[in-house]
Amino acid sequence: GPRSLVLLENLNLRDTHSLFFRSLADRGFELTFRTADDAGLSLIKYGEFLYDNLIIFSPSIEDFGGNINVETITAFIDGGGSVLVAASSDIGDPLRELGSECGIEFDEERTAVIDHHNYDISDPGQHTLIVADAENLLKAPTIVGKKALNPILFRGVGMVADPDNPLVLDILTGSSTSYSFFPDKPITQYPHAVGKNTLLIAGLQARNNARVVFSGSLDFFSDAFFSSAVQKAAPGSKRYSQTGNYELAVALSRWVFKEEGVLRVGAVSHHRVGELAPPNAYTVTDLVEYSIVIEKLSDGKWIPFDGDDIQLEFVRIDPFVRTFLKRNGGKYSVQFKLPDVYGVFQFKVDYNRLGYTHLYSSTQVSVRPLQHTQYERFIPSAYPYYAGAFSMMVGLFMFSIVFLHMKEKEKSD
């Protein structure tokens, strides 16, 4: 199974967060538990990654042990590794640095997300035990799961996404009444995060399809929050016997560790309609058929992907043709007429959808002009020129006859 390194604040977390770790182990993950300051830690050995996934459940760590640091974790992400990070109000510098590398800014140490309208009935008084509604989740079933969830319990630090980073995903936002500040101090300055800008859980899919999820709450993954009842403190609020934390945590782990939302390109073929093999070069205005097999990873097996919005572009610097691919059994195909332009073109499928890995396929082909023998003998648009040429010939012939056979009358003296 996928090799996963779990860095813990202390080994007690194995017991307090056992349901989450058991769900991973049941899905075949090989979990290696270490404390985050263990002197023997290593992610990379001889240029090879020792693990496929990294789970960091050690919010307050000030220095990782062994040869792990923010640079090696960033290199791990650059190499396609998956990382799940859980923080808390007691957050150390390494996690803050890792967040800023990924376009996410954590609030200061000792701050918490506060919501005076959406806190749980069991909150001790600081209104930091927040009930997050499922409506605030990102609308992406591949990331947050397909079923409707009960409200989610959250207690931890707030985050803000870098507005210039288009890769950051706002997976769970605070409500419009939430903000992030020190829970035990009066507010003297504008909070770091206010309203919907407050991120409780954020994600990132890098351009190399590496995935990272940041949760501002370590308690979010705890057995206590998984099995707790939840009810907002507002009068008349509905009581739920269980939170939606477990279902959301499992869905997030399936996505971040690439069990969900992974696409790949299978066989690609192209040829003239009526033929089976691709030619050395196409001719302008040929009728062409293109087909591509796209597969999705599901429970460890590759199955045909079902999408109705996959487009094919026929590109020579700019697209000359852009058309939807139609599903035909296990593959997508389309027939279209090549443009009346010759050059070097590409069949390009560039499919980028929320929650799925970036799918890209390009096949280069040549399109040549018609050979001289392929043109029609007479072109309708040239009829005026033909008429002009033939009328000139006929006119010259008639003029010649008249000129040659006309005698001038002799002048009489």
Swiss-Prot record:
Signal peptide extent: none
Domain of life: Eukaryota
A single GO cellular-component term on record: oligosaccharyltransferase complex
Residue intervals annotated with topology Cytoplasmic: 405-413
Pfam families reported for this sequence: OST48_MD, OST48_N
Residues in compartment: Lumenal: 1-383
Family from the record: Belongs to the DDOST 48 kDa subunit family.
Name of the protein: Dolichyl-diphosphooligosaccharide--protein glycosyltransferase 48 kDa subunit
Protein's organism: Gallus gallus (Chicken)
Lineage summary: Eukaryota, Metazoa, Chordata, Craniata, Vertebrata
Underlying gene: DDOST
